[in-house]
């Protein structure tokens, strides 16, 4: 059996939308789900199991993620946040060649704020806006005091014909 998990998040970020691809000869989805959940580590239980006609390659196809960032101060800078992707927004990026400033505004697809916090749709996958580093930058720039435990990934998306499609819907198209 071969299990491929979706790309990992930083330690401390909760997720409601993780996906795995399992290559197995087992042909009973419900039976596999029960066996898997009985053997997997706590917190990695599966809620769905589907047999697809082709290999979904979810980890390679995911290009965006939705996040909720709990923060009651975000509403105070709602207008600033909701326009953050309309002009350059620079963050420090560390790479093998050193540290440099990068404009991450093209990686922010949508951002909204209300009294509960921030809703962020951003690049994820091969081109990635790391949510942990983005929240660090928000803390520095706007004094929001966001902790990693305040961040929850709500969904993941693939590109299908130039449109974002939820991974669950993408999988249903492969059944």
Regions picked out by a protein language model, each given a short descriptive name:
Residues 16-18, 28, 32:
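Generic hydrophobic, aliphatic-rich segments that mediate packing or membrane embedding
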Residues 30-40, 77-86, 134-138:
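Short amphipathic alpha-helices in soluble, non-transmembrane regions
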Residues 36-76:
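Hydrophobic, well-structured mid-protein blocks that either form specific transmembrane helices
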